[in-house]
Structure formats: structure tokens, C-alpha cells
Design a protein with these regions (language model features):
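Terminal, regulation- and interaction-focused segments at domain boundaries
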Residues: 1-27, 31
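N-terminal catalytic or cofactor-binding beta/alpha core of small enzyme domains
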Residues: 2, 12, 22-23, 42-44, ...
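Conserved active-site and cofactor/substrate-binding residues in soluble primary-metabolism enzymes
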Residues: 10, 14, 59, 93, ...
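A generic alpha-helix structural signal
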Residues: 16-20, 64, 103
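Ser/Thr-rich, low-complexity intrinsically disordered terminal regions
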Residues: 20-62
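N-terminal intrinsically disordered, cationic/polar leader segments
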Residues: 25, 36-37, 68, 107-112
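Beta-strand/loop substructures that line and gate deep hydrophobic ligand-binding cavities in soluble
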Residues: 56-90
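Well-ordered alpha/beta subsegment
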Residues: 96-112
Length: 112
């Protein structure tokens, strides 16, 4: 499992759109689900993506959670499910690659 936290200068909904544009270039990618909740405190946007990785002979998932409760959009990226076997969950770098795809999509908007 690979996890990364970022701060970006765009709205949570835009985060999901940009990540999907980046991931959609892969033939085996899917946008499985999206949930957006707008409140008085801010916006929560969650996206669930899936992609097949030949190196691990498995599908990996990427969960993207973006919030803007304090005036800055915070993004949490978590990839998993790409491992082989019941005991060892070694994914041959698929999770890291999936998180990096999302990070690349947001790079020009990153803060700090």
C-alpha cells in the first residue's frame, strides 16, 4: 500500500477531474466511483480508480480524498489491492506507480 498527502491550489472537484484525465490514458483504467459533499465548512470529494498492472498480474485501486475545510485543498492518495497472494501483498511497485500518476496530474498545483 502506498499513501501520500498533498496540498494543492485547486478545488477538490478539480482534483478528481485532473487525476482521471491522467489515469484515463491507460487502456485498463476505470473511474469506479465518485462522491462529492458540499457543506458550510467546505467540500469533500472522493474518487475511486482502478487500473490493471501486468507486472503484478492484478488490478490496483487508488482512492483520492480531497477536502478544503481550512482554505487549502488537502489531498490524500492511497493505492492498494495490487499485491499477489494471500500472505504476501508485494505489488511490484504498482501502488507506488498509481500514486505517482495522480501526483503527476496535480504537480503544477502543489503547494509547499
Amino acid at each position: 500500500m502506498e499513501v501520500k498527502d498533498l496540498k494543492v491550489s485547486i478545488a477538490p472537484q478539480e482534483v478528481l477531474e485532473l487525476v482521471w484525465q491522467q489515469i484515463n490514458n491507460a487502456i485498463s483504467a476505470q473511474f469506479l466511483d465518485k462522491y462529492i459533499q458540499e457543506t458550510e465548512q467546505g467540500v469533500v470529494a472522493m474518487g475511486l480508480f482502478e487500473k490493471y498492472y501486468m507486472r503484478s498480474s492484478n488490478r490496483a485501486t487508488l482512492t483520492v480524498l480531497a477536502t478544503d475545510f481550512d482554505g487549502v485543498t488537502r489531498v490524500h492518495l492511497a493505492a492498494g489491492g495490487g499485491g499477489q497472494g494471500a500472505i504476501f501483498r508485494f505489488d511490484w511497485g504498482a501502488g507506488e506507480d498509481f500514486v505517482e500518476l495522480a501526483e503527476d496530474a496535480l504537480r503544477q498545483y502543489m503547494l509547499e
